From Swiss-Prot:
Name this protein carries in UniProt: Sialidase
Additional detail: The variable lengths of the long tandem repeat domain could account in part for the polymorphism of the TCNA protein.
CDD domains: Sialidase_non-viral
Residues that carry a glycan: N342, N394, N1125
Gene3D superfamilies cross-referenced by the UniProt entry: 2.120.10.10, 2.60.120.200
Organism encoding this protein: Trypanosoma cruzi
Catalytic activity: Hydrolysis of alpha-(2->3)-, alpha-(2->6)-, alpha-(2->8)- glycosidic linkages of terminal sialic acid residues in oligosaccharides, glycoproteins, glycolipids, colominic acid and synthetic substrates
Biased composition (Polar residues): 616-689, 699-1123
Amino acid sequence: MVAIADARYETSSENSLIDTVAKYSVDDGETWETQIAIKNSRVSSVSRVVDPTVIVKGNKLYVLVGSYYSSRSYWSSHGDARDWDILLAVGEVTKSTAGGKITASIKWGSPVSLKKFFPAEMEGMHTNQFLGGAGVAIVASNGNLVYPVQVTNKRKQVFSKIFYSEDDGKTWKFGKGRSDFGCSEPVALEWEGKLIINTRVDWKRRLVYESSDMEKPWVEAVGTVSRVWGPSPKSNQPGSQTSFTAVTIEGMRVMLFTHPLNFKGRCVRDRLNLWLTDNQRIYNVGQVSIGDENSAYSSVLYKDDKLYCLHEINTDEVYSLVFARLVGELRIIKSVLRSWKNWTATCPAFAPLLIQPLRRQRVVVVPLSPRLVLLAFCRQRLPKRMGGSYRCVNASTANAERVRNGLKFAGVGGGALWPVSQQGQNQRYRFANHAFTLVASVTIHEAPRAASPLLGASLDSSGGKKLLGLSYDEKHQWQPIYGSTPVTPTGSWETGKRYHLVLTMANKIGSVYIDGELLEGSGQTVVPDGRTPDISHFYVGGYKRSDMPTISHVTVNNVLLYNRRQLNTEEIRTLFLSQDLIGTEAHMDSSSDSSAHSTPSTPADSSAHSTPSTPVDSSAHSTPSTPADSSAHGTPSTPVDSSAHGTPSTPADSSAHGTPSTPVDSSAHSTPSTPVDSSAHSTPSTPVDSSAHGAPSTPADSSAHGTPSTPVDSSAHGTPSTPADSSAHSTPSTPADSSAHSTPSTPADSSAHSTPSTPVDSSAHGTPSTPADSSAHSTPSTPADSSAHGTPSTPVDSSAHSTPSTPVDSSAHGTPSTPVDSSAHSTPSTPVDSSAHGTPSTPVDSSAHSTPSTPADSSAHSTPSTPADSSAHGTPSTPVDSSAHSTPSTPADSSAHSTPSTPVDSSAHSTPSTPADSSAHGTPSTPVDSSAHGTPSTPADSSAHSTPSTPADSSAHSTPSTPADSSAHSTPSTPVDSSAHSTPSTPADSSAHSTPSTPADSSAHSTPSTPADSSAHSTPSTPVDSSAHSTPSTPADSSAHGTPSTPADSSAHSTPSTPVDSSAHSTPSTPADSSAHGTPSTPADSSAHSTPSTPADSSAHGTPSTPADSSAHSTPSTPAGSSANGTVLILPDGAALSTFSGGGLLLCACALLLHVFFMAVF
């Protein structure tokens, strides 16, 4: 692995003393060698070589840099080229093996000037200077070396060109095409026989061009990705360099693109986001930088099924490089690509087919060209949002009622809206301003009192100014709309008849088709002045039009959007004939929008706040992103799925350092979002299934602790609900499916880290249900998992205070079951403790709301029993496992809402315990495991919502515990592994954004740990494994949001630690690894977003490691100047196969040379 970067020794200015340096590793980043690749001329204090742009071919590195001797101004402001030169240095990599040890070296040739290849005149202009695009350049499929470059002319105008060599660098030429003026720092890739050149534009949206031949002019890619990304929320700030690379993932060729949101403005450029596109659909993977850190220049590398990002961070003009492993982001990408492939595979050319996976969506898809963009589908339940089938952009709905095969809009303002420019900064349907085809099937149920809108494109947010549309009037006539051109009503319509509508616009000409026939008067100019329109949104009905003179009654069966020219007559006819297939049952279960970011478990206990099992996407601590998909540490977006402790988002799909399960968007710990799937620990949502401890909900199935409801399954201790399904610990929702502790969402399916269960939804104190949805953070189980306060269910996984099943462990109000552990929100244990919000446990007894019991197993409001397991609301028993809301018992396991017990295992919402395992939002417990809303217990394992315990394993948001295992939302514990967002830890290894590790307990959002492995924003813990927002723990291994590691350590965003290996965003430390955004630590290795440290090993968003230190978001180590905008290259077996780079500003306020690089573990 090789890194190339600017080394700025004295200041962060680009006009200072700068060298180009290289650092390389042959042992997966364990050790590094450093070289100066290209020295500046040393003729003045501002001599410099800048903006390295790198090509890798075979085992050679071609590095192009600009050279300046004494000038002190920015290069594009130079009036002539006297102080400028352009240099090419070639490095040759050799590797050898001796005695089983691999060694490598890079031999750099002397830089050669290429100034002689730069013509004095170009396309009628007098030229001045040129530089590389500052990033990765490419080797074309024909073997040519291709550099995208930025050129200035004598008028100081900047534009982009292609600079290429056909003979491995001996001679060079400029291609004929060029960009518009103002386009700088270009990056390029090869795509389907063309070059795609992506350029920075200050104060405006990015321009992307296509070039099919070096001898032909460039063409702006207006129908795909040009003008999609803005430099800031209002597109009125400077732009930024970007990474733009083509890779093959899951068998699909796609492009990865990074770009900061720049909320702060100017050249600060904060919140670096990662995007995915196949040159048709565009998906926001999420934010890859942390919080609001300034992270302009970046580079992405995908190699050996691993994804990495190198980016700079700027803190008060002190620059550092950060290298991050994007584990969760890669899982999200794979999930999205599976969705795309499933939809595409289900829709062969001209073969329309209705999609209805898992009863959640109904859409007819007719791909008429490779450039098909499916706009949205209708959800089964009453929606506030209609999600795009390709998971890119959602639509908003108002006054919508779910009907067979579609949505019925009724009442004033009833309709749907799909944003175009309303998406804000990043507009994924920007192509529609040039050409589009909009298709829908509609049925009108009654005549309006005046003309009412039916379908179209609007130029303003109010919907008053339309570009193209169709209305229907009280005389049963159609009223087409062609811009401001007056049109006479034509044709006729019938009540109750379904019509197939097609609206097309290309070359500023609009047409309307009804049932395959061109409507009279079509073919009108919709933009008379010739300007390019700026479409605000597409609409169906009178979406939120309060000025509507009539109440609309329209049913929409399907809506599709094509990003292409007007369809021809044959294609229109094909669309019309396919409508008869609408209503056919579907075949594409895998493409459904099921729960997200969790992975299914088989014959096991599924619960909330469980850690991911296999390829899962977990998310957390994301910040808002605006008009975009927001994800981990992202910022708000508009109509979108939000996740992981994120703030509300509007149109976007958000996730956070998580890993999706099956082509699905899921979230957890998220705050309210609109058109989104909301889950775990969220507050009420609309059209959602709400659960556990929820307040009343309407049209839903209410469960878990609920009081009676009408035609509904209501359960344990909840407040009444009407036709709704509510489940454990959630707040009220309206016609929606929400789950435990979830925040409000609108028309979405909320699940909370759970995966689907088998047609049954059982809940606390509820009666058995069939074909239903199971909730509260549970994952599916096969031979059934039953939980507290429920009645029995059969081969199904029931969650959150649900009733017992057979063969299972029955709890609260249930009948006993054998060897199975069922509980709501429990974490995994072996043969023991079941707790709330955890993962499954085996041969253990969990219960809920039970009172104390004596050597017996009693359940649900039962009186004391002997040698048995007691559960919910039962009377006291001794040596028994009691749980959930139980009163104190002795030598027993108590859980969920239980009162204090002694030698007992209590979980979920329990009070503090000592020598026990406490978890999730619990209060402290003593040598006892207490669970679910229980009071303190002694010698036991306490979990879910419990407070601190000592010598235990504590996790997610837990409070401290003593000799116990604490999990989920618990506070500090001792001898424990603390993770994510924790503060200082001592003798431990810290990790970041990683998922479970072995042998160690890793979790997320935990607080500090001591003699333990502390990671990601975690605080110290003592001899306990604490995770997820937990407080300090000691000797343990902690991780968060990462992938599993074995006796290894990964960390991020943690604060200072002592003899510990911490990483990610930490400040400098000495022989140790310190973590993310942390303060200094002693004898530790500091890495990731940290200032330089010595012998350190850092990794990012950690992937599995073995007895090694892995860290995340690590910055350069070793006393040196800092570097940025670098290039990373993978050089396996002497062959440089991939590149990874950035370019531009980098500083470490240190006059020392060389050691200016980040550390990384591969």
